[in-house]
């Protein structure tokens, strides 16, 4: 029963539809019994949904993926770990969009507060796309919480949109790994030095 209504029709692509509909006292509706429209059964999809993801609604498929995020200060190994794990598990990984954005739009090595919001939004869009390409796991380098921490570190405030995205990120990931700053510092031109790395790492740890 659905509310005050009974079951009126039973839809399937299987011969057992006749027996089920009789048991339910409803009309049997056979759909695509020869599987010309969808040449696959639900039981086959269930055995390996990642192999047959083209038959699964994107909203459903995203929930089948374990999204694992790596956070930490710059030069803590997030990118290396995410990429290597993706290769090991034959899946994709989500690079830190902020790095790409910074290299393209920074002025005197700085970004404005609204640009940090754009980074968080752009990262999320790309991450959702990667979820649909992933095989069982998605390994994600950085999230909106870290972008929020950058905003607070450089500007002492974050736009409302970034605050909202950071809050949503608290419950978005299945696993969160904090990478440590106990490895040698890679002093590239886009970073703020080893001393700042340690300071920023303590802020991230405190926030967690």
What are these regions (language model features)?
Residues 78:
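Conserved lysine of the Walker
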Residues 1-67:
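Nucleotidyltransferase catalytic core that binds NTPs
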Residues 155-207:
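A glycine- and Lys/Arg-enriched "phosphate-lid" helix/loop adjacent to the NTP-binding pocket
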Residues 74:
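The conserved Walker
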Residues 120-170, 186:
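Glycine-rich phosphate-binding loop used to anchor ATP phosphates in small-molecule kinases
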Residues 81, 85:
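Hydrophobic positions on the alpha1 helix immediately C-terminal to the Walker A/P-loop
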Residues 70:
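Hydrophobic anchor at the beta1->P-loop junction of P-loop NTPases
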Residues 87-129:
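Conserved substrate/cofactor phosphate-moiety recognition/catalytic segment
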């Amino acid at each position: 029963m659905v509310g005050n209504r009974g079951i009126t029709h039973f839809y399937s692509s299987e011969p057992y539809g006749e027996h089920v509909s009789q048991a339910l006292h409803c009309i049997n509706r056979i759909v695509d019994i020869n599987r010309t429209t969808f040449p696959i059964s639900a039981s086959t999809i269930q055995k390996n949904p990642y192999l047959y993801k083209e038959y699964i609604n994107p909203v459903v498929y995203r929930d089948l993926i374990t999204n694992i995020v790596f956070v930490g200060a710059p030069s803590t190994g997030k990118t290396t770990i995410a990429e290597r794990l993706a290769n090991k598990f034959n899946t994709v990984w989500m690079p830190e969009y902020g790095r790409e954005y910074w290299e393209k739009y920074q002025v005197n090595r700085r970004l404005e507060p609204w640009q940090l919001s754009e980074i968080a939004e752009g990262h999320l869009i790309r991450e959702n796309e990667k979820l649909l390409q992933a095989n069982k796991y998605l390994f994600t380098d950085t999230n909106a919480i870290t972008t929020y921490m950058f905003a607070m570190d450089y500007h002492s405030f974050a736009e409302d949109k970034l605050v909202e995205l950071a809050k949503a990120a608290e419950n978005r990931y299945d696993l969160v790994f904090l990478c440590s700053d106990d490895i040698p510092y890679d002093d590239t031109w886009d970073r703020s030095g080893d001393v700042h790395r340690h300071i920023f790492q303590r802020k991230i740890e405190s926030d967690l």
